Curated annotation (Swiss-Prot):
Has a role in transcriptional regulation. Acts in parallel with the Ras/MAPK and the PI3K/PKB pathways in the control of cell identity and cellular growth. Essential for regulation of the cytoskeleton and cell growth but not for cell proliferation or growth rate. Required specifically for the microtubule-based basal transport of lipid droplets. Plays a partially redundant function downstream of Raf in cell fate specification in the developing eye. Pair-rule protein that regulates embryonic cellularization, gastrulation and segmentation. The modification Phosphoserine is found at residues 451, 453, 829-830, 879, 881, 1368. Residues 859-871 bind DNA. It comes from Drosophila erecta (Fruit fly). Residues 69-78, 429-442, 1073-1090, 1234-1251, 1260-1288 have a biased composition (Basic and acidic residues). This is AF4/FMR2 family member lilli. Residues 582-591 have a biased composition (Gly residues).
């Protein structure tokens, strides 16, 4: 039978030689290799007797029918199982790994879905389509699926990999893969619809990302050609994630040889010999593989494939900085990293094969480090090990199946038939397209690996690494880790660290039997030098594009001269494939990418290291959106949402924190070139991999439990983090965030801030980082956070945190400090720790650092996250920011506080915090602070300034509102205290004190509090924005929403933004109240003594707890009541806070980046204070204290409130500040004051160097003023208490006051006085802040050059402005933001000072300032204040903008996914606008006009892309996103039309004047002359008729006609501008997108018809980032 089948196959292939040239070669190879093939076929027959015989005996007609069926199925999102089934025949031998592989692949589906939705510029094919890249590399041996034994194995490998379902259904596939033609076998593939979309890259599947991925999808029908696989990086990524078996053809069957289905047609011949050569006959592919019936369809010509691949490669490789280009790659690579482990396992035989001589040399170093974590490989040692090809590449589950095909493929290269055919075209494609694909892979891979590896880690923790990094690690757990450690020396130390992490993971995995088995297989495979790397390292090195795919890495490595770019050894070495694989991949599911890179860093690969960098970087994040994945997102690590990764990360982060610092910085200034080499590896470890792998490794305490939790955690959460990281990275790359991906962006912005910047939460619960545009920063939206709320419970986010929402905030804070992007993974873990906070806003605050992941984490880990942190995994990530918060009890927070205090810089803080939190969360966590940990955590993360309030709010939603106010305020106070040297005062945010703060920091706070109540959200948003320098404008909205929440958020914000500020304002108000309480409540002496003792013990100044302890008294119930009371009482106070809102307003107006940087500068003091968080925190339940004082505090009069207005005043002020700009500004200022006052003594040298000089002076003055202010405040509080004895108010105030014992209240009063003085001394503080901003600026360099320049200019301006104590902070903000509110600045100076001061030295001062604040705080900044926004643009910048625009447009042209394409186009448009704007200054008017016109035509074309979606119901998430893109597009069109009119306004004026003269004079002859009736009736009838028919009128001279035409043109532009604007407004209202637009307005300043092109750029970029994050989150959820 085997012989007959082979003969039939050969005959059929010969018949089809005309259509399949490569098949002839493969047939020849088959003939030569028939003896071996027969053996293989015999084996194959055992698996695939019936179906194979049917498939191979199929005629052309049958094949065509089958192709049609497959196409239809693909269109339906169902991957055809035919080839996959046959492919499974061989892999099925690997029974041990089947279950594990299935579990892993099942997770991959989710990851693929995420990639499809999340990644931009990457099209996703069905696994087959993605595999095509690998497939082209694969010999097309099986004409159909497995015509020849080797083809069967290769196609089997490709099939399983291509079928996402294979991951989910490994067992089934093994049973059915013999029956290639049975698609039902892949019913699960429906789950892979997004990834499988590209499987058949035929244009008919526009929705599927795969098709769009390559401009030249080879077959229009479902299965993409090898070329389409090559061209479709996303599809390759998907395939890799599912299992990129096609990659198994390194030498590869020519790309064309592969069937459109992804099957290799005539390649069977070469594979069999390759099998014999490479495998040495270990595994004989089943004879069924010969059967031509299944996959003999001719693959598209190689020309098409090469062209597509080259085009894609050119587009993406040329633009490493392009966030879009880079972002897609990282996720794809992560997907491949997940698959890579299997590939490496199966690649073992390949190195031995002659064709893989080069590869094997490289491969041998690689050791197939990415041993798939699938135990089945062990079970299938003979064939699986023999088949290093597709099985390993295809994916964990597909490992067995893929092995045979891949193994066969390696022999094929020796034959040189397929090797010769495919390598030539493959290499060029590889060189060009590998980069682009690699980039996409890195982003996608990060996304996939984050979610999938997280899930896999959870699932496989017992078996193997389980994560993509785990899978890669598990495969290479021993040998792989060894190889990675060996290879690491070649690579950056990051890889070595990653190796350590991997080794740790491996150790954990080794504990598991399946893990051990996999390791054995891995070792065996590693001995076979197969170059499979979990990443797409092969892709970069491998000639074949398929190899470029991570899953195809084995074949690719073989094809590319044994680079083993599979992400294992060599490939990682060359590109940053290792970094990509290690960082991206490792960041994703595991540090599989990282380990892979560590394992695969072969010298040969080191040349291609650059490609990995690009992919690697976006992966880091995620992030951001999101780091992110590392892309996922710099903002927030993708894994955090699950929480599982977070726990491991804290340990890993700790180890790699030093390098992470660098990574964080790189992310902050995420320049693809430089950062990607070092950073990518680091990011791979930390950010790129979302530090998930490190988390898994380091969270050994969590180990199986935590990883299992990760497995339980929805991949949406994990991937979401990756996606976020990726998004933030993208945004950064695009210049919005200056980060490779959204996650990166958030993480980077956060990192930039270090502990220093206070992130702001926007209305949408977006965390605003001072240096990062709000949109970019806000990778995670409120909705994503909410959607992820449930996941957090699943996520490893420590469940212990649940009891104390505050603890998550600490984590958030840590990410802040960590903000140095790589902290994206850290952020994720911190988010996981944070999940206990229930408010999306809180999560967002944390998320803002790593935006999307944090949100996921927060939501996921509400209950569990703390446990995980306690377990030590997530605690490590957020240990710095949420060390104690990571543990619900907050012990880590206390430990984290010390590190925070120690690390002045955000990055150093992040690292130290991570280390300390790791240690503290693992062993240092004192459980004293149960409720406060979260509170402190929020403050700890200046980024999560609002996190403090939101965390407490999340804890008890409305009831927590009040408590969150006091507890979060106190915790934020603690944070500030830690940041500021002291702040050991137990700071209960009193309503009065908090309110002002809320105004100041309400912007950031709002998102965090959004979870609890709208009011809280608004308040917190204001606080956060104030902290982040009004990065988010939502504060104005938030202020009105919840006055009491404003109080909470304000205190939180002030404390978070500036520990001193929050402490001082709350301490002045609260101390006054506390004093009143002392006087009024007169708590029993026992209580007073206790409080006093506690305060002394934990008061740094008192020397307790080594001066690092803090006592946080939180009364959730009290605070809840207070929140309600404040809400009722806030109407009166709003007037006082307006000044702060005005200041905030100024900030919010600032460019997102500028705002964020300003926020960073202002917030940096907060972070500075954060380091001062005491390691010892005592949390006292206010319920145990008398509550009368709280009531009194509530009722404090505005005068008593001093710096903080009464809740009513705050509400009024907040309301008055529509955008909350003033509020934001004030909080930032407050933060400055706080930091100068308290944190400095305890600040690290670096931090002190930045802030201490001014702070020291301020401290002395503050100390002096404190005594005076304390006395004054005490008197005032007494009076106020007497006045405000009303029970409700008293209770609230009492909570704050009670929490702050009389002793604490005194200290708070002192701090208030200090802060007042600080306000007076604002000049030094602002100066310090500007310097901080400048320091952070480099972090934000990733932002568009335009933004960077603006930021730098703004920072300089801020420094200059610092001279003015009051006006300077606000002015800074104004300078920083394109829309700074100068009037606000003018009016805000006092307000800002107050904000910074947190409270004037005396209540009187506060009261006096408060009234002016409303007057001073103009909701909108002056229109004339932004004229200085862009003082100059240099021509080089224009070129850069133009290049960015062109690169994005080309990427969009090739993009198949509608959403990704539209977003890429719109990004290109805004870059074109920046180019045209620059041309206005240095080019001719005509050239500028032409540029705008062309841009307008382009955007009009783009608008046609989302019209179909606009008409559909907006309930559909996709339609909602398209509607939002349409809104942004309409706004751009409107402003472009207006610009075109303005450019020609002079001409228009002249024309109008001329026409007016013409019409006024009435000259012009009547059409028929003076005699309407023609000259004479005798004229010809014709003439008469014509004359009579001529309508009466005037003859218009040609010049007048021309002028009329011009006038029509000019006025048409003007009319279009207003009409399009109105259309956008209508769409906002009808589509219910008001919140989305309001959020963007708060973050970036409202977009108006007066907005400049730079403002349009920032606004649109922020909106696109937000949308990408939103798209990625649903994907995670669905997964």
């Amino acid at each position: 039978m085997a012989q007959q089948q082979q003969q039939q196959l050969q005959q059929q292939q010969q018949h089809h030689t005309s259509s399949i040239n490569n098949n002839n070669n493969s047939i020849l190879l088959l003939q030569q290799q028939q003896p071996q093939q027969q053996q293989q076929l015999d084996q194959l027959q055992q698996y695939n007797n019936n179906l194979y015989s049917q498939n191979y005996n199929m005629e052309e007609y049958e094949r065509r029918k089958r192709r049609e069926r497959e196409k239809i199925e693909r269109q339906q999102g169902i991957q055809i199982d035919d080839r996959e089934t046959s492919l499974f025949g061989e892999p099925r031998r690997v029974t041990e790994g089947d279950a594990e592989i299935t579990a892993a692949l099942g997770e991959f589906f989710e990851a693929r879905v995420y990639i499809n939705n999340q990644t931009v510029g990457i099209s996703r094919s069905a696994p087959g389509a993605g595999n095509p890249r690998l497939q082209p590399n694969m010999p097309p041996q099986g004409k159909s699926l497995g015509h020849s034994p080797s083809s069967a194995s290769a196609s089997a490998a490709a099939g399983p990999t291509s079928a996402s379902a294979t991951t989910a259904l490994p067992g089934q596939q093994q049973q059915h893969y013999q029956q290639q033609q049975r698609p039902p076998t892949y019913v699960k593939q429906a789950d892979n619809k997004p990834p499988y979309n590209g499987r058949g890259g035929y244009p008919g599947q526009p929705m599927k990302n795969d098709i769009p991925s390559s401009s030249g999808m080879a077959p229009p029908r479902g299965p993409p050609r090898s070329s389409s696989s090559n061209s479709n990086s996303s599809s390759a990524t998907n395939n890799a994630s599912s299992g990129g078996v096609p990659a198994s053809t390194p030498l590869g069957p020519p790309l064309s040889t592969q069937m459109p289905n992804g099957r290799e047609k005539s390649f069977l011949g070469p594979p069999a010999p390759a099998l014999h050569n490479g495998t040495g006959g270990r595994f004989v592919p089943p004879a069924a593989s010969k059967r031509p019936g299944v996959g003999q369809q001719p693959p598209p010509p190689e020309k098409d494939v090469n062209k597509i691949i080259s085009d894609i490669a050119n587009i993406f490789t040329v633009q490493p900085l392009t966030l879009i280009a880079a972002t897609p790659h990282a996720p794809t690579r992560e997907n491949y990293n997940l698959l890579a482990p299997n590939k490496q396992k199966y690649a073992m035989d390949i190195p031995s094969s002659p064709p893989s001589a080069e590869p094997s040399s490289l491969m041998t170093p690689l050791f197939a480090p990415i041993a798939s974590p699938i135990a089945p490989l062990v079970t299938t040692p003979p064939q699986a090990s023999q088949l290093p090809l597709g099985g390993a590449t295809s994916g964990t589950i597909l490992a067995g199946e893929a092995l045979a095909p891949l193994h066969q493929l390696p022999p094929t290269p020796p034959k040189a038939a397929s090797g010769v055919t495919s390598p030539g075209p493959g290499k060029p494609l590889k060189t060009e397209k590998n980069h682009s694909l690699e980039k996409q892979d890195s982003c996608l891979e990060n996304d996939l690996e984050l979610s999938e590896s997280e899930d896999e880690q959870r699932k496989k923790e017992g078996r193997s690494a389980g994560n993509s990094s785990n899978s890669s690690e598990s495969d290479s757990s021993e040998s792989g880790s060894e190889s990675s450690s060996k290879n690491d020396p070649q690579h950056h130390p990051n890889h070595q660290q990653h190796h350590h992490q991997l080794q740790q993971q491996q150790q954990q995995q080794q504990q598991q039997a399946s893990m051990q088995q996999q390791q054995v297989l891995q070792q065996q495979q590693q001995h076979r030098p197969q170059p499979l790397t979990s990443n797409g390292a092969q892709n970069k090195k491998f000639r074949h594009e398929i190899i470029a795919r991570g899953s195809n890495t084995i074949t690719g490595l073989l094809s590319s001269s044994g680079f083993g770019s599979g992400g294992s050894v060599g490939p990682a070495g060359l590109n940053s494939s290792a970094a990509m694989g290690a960082g991206s991949g490792s960041g994703g599911t595991l540090s599989s990418g990282g380990s892979s890179s560590n394992k695969t860093p072969s010298p040969t690969e080191s040349n291609k290291w650059n490609l990995s960098r690009f992919f690697h970087k976006p992966a880091n994040q995620t992030n951001s959106e999101n780091v992110s994945p590392g892309n996922v997102s710099m903002k927030v690590p993708g894994i955090l949402p699950g929480g599982a990764q977070i726990i491991p990360e804290s340990i890993d982060v700790t180890t790699a924190i030093v390098k992470n610092e660098k990574i964080h910085d790189d992310h902050m200034a995420m320049e693809d070139g430089e950062e990607e080499d070092d950073d990518e590896e680091q990011q791979l470890r930390y950010g790129g991999g979302l530090s998930v792998t490190p988390v898994a490794v380091k969270k050994e305490a969590i180990d199986a439990v935590s990883e299992m939790a990760l497995g339980a955690i929805p991949k949406t959460q994990i991937k979401r983090e990756s996606a976020e990281a990726l998004l933030s990275a993208r945004l950064s790359d695009s210049g919005t965030s200056a980060s490779g991906s959204s996650s990166s962006s958030s993480s980077s912005s956060d990192s930039a801030v270090g502990g220093e910047v206070v992130p702001k939460l926007g209305l949408g619960e977006i965390l605003q980082l001072p240096g990062v545009p709000a949109a970019i920063t806000t990778v995670m939206r409120v909705q994503p956070t909410q959607s992820q709320k449930a996941p957090p419970s699943n996520s490893v986010t420590l469940t212990p945190i649940l009891p104390l929402p505050t603890s998550p905030k600490q984590r958030q804070k840590k990410p802040r400090k960590k903000k140095a992007v790589t902290s994206a993974p850290i952020l994720d873990s911190s988010d996981d720790d944070e999940p206990p906070p229930k408010h999306p806003g809180l999560d967002h605050t944390a998320v803002s650092v790593q935006t999307p992941p944090a949100a996921d984490t927060v939501k996921k880990g509400r209950g569990r996250p703390r446990k995980q942190q306690q377990s030590g995994g997530s605690g490590n990530l957020s240990s710095a920011s949420a060390g104690s918060s990571s543990q619900t009890k907050g012990p880590t927070l206390t430990a984290a506080k010390k590190p925070l205090a120690k690390t002045p810089l955000a990055m150093s803080r992040a690292r130290k915090r991570e280390h300390s939190s790791q240690s503290s969360s693992n062993g240092n966590t004192p459980t004293k602070k149960v409720a406060t940990p979260q509170l402190v955590a929020a403050p700890l993360k200046p980024t999560s300034v609002t996190a403090g309030s939101s965390s407490s709010d999340e804890d008890s939603s409305s009831s927590a509102e009040s408590s969150s106010k006091s507890s979060s305020s106190s915790s934020s106070s603690d944070d500030t205290e830690t940041q500021n040297t002291n702040c050991r005062i137990v700071k209960l945010n009193k309503t009065g004190a908090v309110q002002k703060k809320a105004l100041l920091g309400s912007g950031s706070s709002s998102p965090s509090s959004s979870g609890s109540e709208p009011e809280d959200q608004t308040t917190r948003s204001q606080v956060g924005s104030g902290q982040a320098l009004a990065q988010q404008l939502p504060p104005y909205k938030q202020l009105p929403i919840s006055q009491h929440s404003q109080h909470l958020s304000s205190s939180e914000c002030s404390s978070s933004s500036g520990g001193c500020t929050a402490v001082c304002s709350s301490s002045s108000g609260e101390e006054d109240e506390g004093r009143r309480e002392k006087e009024r409540e007169r708590k029993p002496k026992s209580d007073k003594n206790k409080i006093s003792t506690l305060t002394r013990i934990f008061n740094p100044k008192e020397g307790g707890a080594k001066k690092q302890g803090q006592v946080v008294i939180v009364d959730l119930q009290e605070e809840q009541q207070q929140g309600k009371l404040d809400a009722a009482a806030q109407p009166p106070p709003p007037q006082a806070p307006p000044a702060a809102p005005a200041a905030i307003m100024a900030k919010p107006r600032m460019t997102p980046t500028q705002q964020q940087q300003l926020g960073a500068g202002l917030a940096s003091p907060a972070r500075t204070t954060t380091p001062h968080l005491t390691s010892l925190i005592c949390k006292i339940d206010l319920s145990k204290l008398s509550r009368e004082r709280i009531m009194r505090l509530k009722k404090l009069t505005p005068a008593q409130q001093n710096g903080h207005l009464t809740p009513k005043d705050q509400a009024t002020n907040a309301v008055h500040v529509p955008n909350g700009y003033a509020g934001d500004t004030n909080p930032a200022t407050k933060v400055k004051h706080e930091h100068p006052v308290k944190p400095e003594p305890e600040l690290d040298a670096g931090y002190e160097a930045k802030f201490k000089p001014g702070n020291v002076k301020q401290e002395f003055q503050l100390k002096q003023e404190r005594d005076r202010d304390r006395e004054r405040e005490r008197e005032r509080e007494r009076e106020r208490d007497r006045e405000r004895e009303q029970p409700p108010g008293r209770r609230r105030k009492r909570s704050s006051s009670s929490s702050s014992s009389p002793y604490k209240e005194k200290k708070r009063k002192k701090e208030k006085a200090d802060q007042l003085q600080i306000g007076k001394e604002l000049l030094p503080v602002p100066v310090l802040l500007p310097s901080n901003n400048h320091e952070r600026m480099p972090n934000h360099d990733r932002l568009s050059y335009d933004k960077l320049q603006l930021l730098h200019e703004d920072a300089a301006a801020v420094i200059g402005d610092v001279s003015a104590a009051n006006g300077s902070p606000t002015k800074k903000m104004m300078v920083m933001s394109p829309l700074p509110p100068p009037p606000t600045v003018t009016v805000a100076p006092a307000t800002c000072n107050e904000a910074v001061q947190t409270t004037p030295p005396s209540a009187t001062t506060a009261s006096a300032t408060a009234p002016p604040v409303p007057a001073t705080r103009l909701i909108y900044r002056s229109y004339f204040d932004r004229d200085v926004e862009h003082p100059s643009d240099d021509p080089r910048k224009n070129n850069q903008f133009l290049q960015e625009a062109i690169s994005r447009k080309h990427a969009a042209d090739l993009e198949r996914d509608s959403f990704n394409q539209v977003t890429l186009y719109l990004e290109a448009v805004v870059y074109f606008l920046l180019t045209a704007d620059a041309m206005e200054r240095c080019s001719s008017e005509q050239a500028t006009n032409t540029m705008y016109k062309d841009t307008l035509s382009l955007i009009k074309f783009i608008s046609t892309k989302f019209r179909p979606y606009q008409q559909q119901s907006t309930t559909n998430i996709q339609h909602e996103t398209h509607n939002k893109v349409a809104i942004l597009s309409l706004r751009c069109q409107s402003l472009i039309s207006l610009k075109l009119y303005k450019l020609r306004r002079k001409d228009c004026r002249a024309v109008i004047n001329s026409l007016a003269d013409f019409f006024r004079v009435g000259r012009g002859d009547i059409a028929n002359g003076n005699t309407p009736s023609s000259i004479s009736p005798s004229n010809s009838v014709g003439s008469q008729g014509s004359g009579s028919n001529t309508p009466p009128g005037r003859i218009v001279p040609p010049d007048i006609h021309n002028m009329l035409c011009k006038e029509n043109e000019f006025l048409s532009y003007l009319n279009s501008a207003h009409e399009l604007w109105d259309q956008a407004d209508r769409l906002v209202r009808t589509g219910n997108h008001i919140d989305f637009i309001r959020e963007l307005d708060h973050e970036n300043g409202p977009l108006t018809l007066h907005s400049t092109m730079h403002e349009v750029f920032r606004y649109v970029q922020a909106g696109l980032k937000t949308l990408r994050d939103a798209v990625s989150h649903p994907t995670h959820q669905s997964q």
